[in-house]
């Protein structure tokens, strides 16, 4: 179980709902992953018309919590407007805030992100900010009212996995009591297990599952990897050593002369 902003969640895996081959495969992947939170783009809902209505009905039928996002927004005004519309459409104050600064890398505009987070937090939103692994930016987001942070481990959709382990370790150590959810850049179940072993509270991913040859199987694999990584962290991992350490005791050995 995972306590997140006063809500008990059975799974530490959050799953995106875009790019799946079909609605049926999306539904099966969500079920196979064990997730209890899915992200949904308001832009998709508004642009989809009748298809968007069917998609929304499908998501509701899965019985999972909705985390709307402001994907595709490149300005504070656009992101704030989208967030407010999402609250009306989906009936939740949770919002994954994205303010994109670069078309090429999809790197967040951290200045706009902090400004947008402050506006939305003051308006009663629970903001999940998609951010970098920069500690100063993280501090500013917390000062703005955020109670959870969502640092990337690599650019969105890159599947590179954690490219800066030192930064991720520093973030976990610097914010021991803040829920930290790794968002973006995970490509393999082993990547998810790795960041969970660092002590991160959860992961959010989309492309690695949606564009896999078998999305349902990959969703199941990620669910198991997240659980394994968390259990490993909770059980106490051994620190790496530069020298060999015998696993067999040397006491009581026979001595031949």
From Swiss-Prot:
EC number, UniProt record: 2.8.1.10
Signal peptide: none
MF annotations from Gene Ontology: thiazole synthase activity
Annotated active site: 96 (schiff-base intermediate with dxp)
Broad EC category: transferase
Coiled-coil stretches: none
Disulfide linkage: none
Catalysed reactions, as listed in the record: [ThiS sulfur-carrier protein]-C-terminal-Gly-aminoethanethioate + 2-iminoacetate + 1-deoxy-D-xylulose 5-phosphate = [ThiS sulfur-carrier protein]-C-terminal Gly-Gly + 2-[(2R,5Z)-2-carboxy-4-methylthiazol-5(2H)-ylidene]ethyl phosphate + 2 H2O + H(+)
Compartment(s) where it occurs, according to its Swiss-Prot or TrEMBL record: Cytoplasm
Keyword Transferase: yes
GO cellular component: cytoplasm
Annotated Gene3D superfamilies: Aldolase class I
A biological process term (GO) from this entry: thiamine diphosphate biosynthetic process
Keyword Transferase included in the entry's annotation: yes
Matches recorded under Pfam families: ThiG
Cited SUPFAM superfamilies: ThiG-like
Positions annotated to bind 1-deoxy-D-xylulose 5-phosphate: 157, 184-185, 206-207
Pathway membership: Cofactor biosynthesis; thiamine diphosphate biosynthesis
Function: Catalyzes the rearrangement of 1-deoxy-D-xylulose 5-phosphate (DXP) to produce the thiazole phosphate moiety of thiamine. Sulfur is provided by the thiocarboxylate moiety of the carrier protein ThiS. In vitro, sulfur can be provided by H(2)S.
Complex and partners: Homotetramer. Forms heterodimers with either ThiH or ThiS.
Family: Belongs to the ThiG family.
Name the UniProt record assigns to this protein: Thiazole synthase
Species whose genome carries this gene: Mesorhizobium japonicum (strain LMG 29417 / CECT 9101 / MAFF 303099)
Gene: thiG
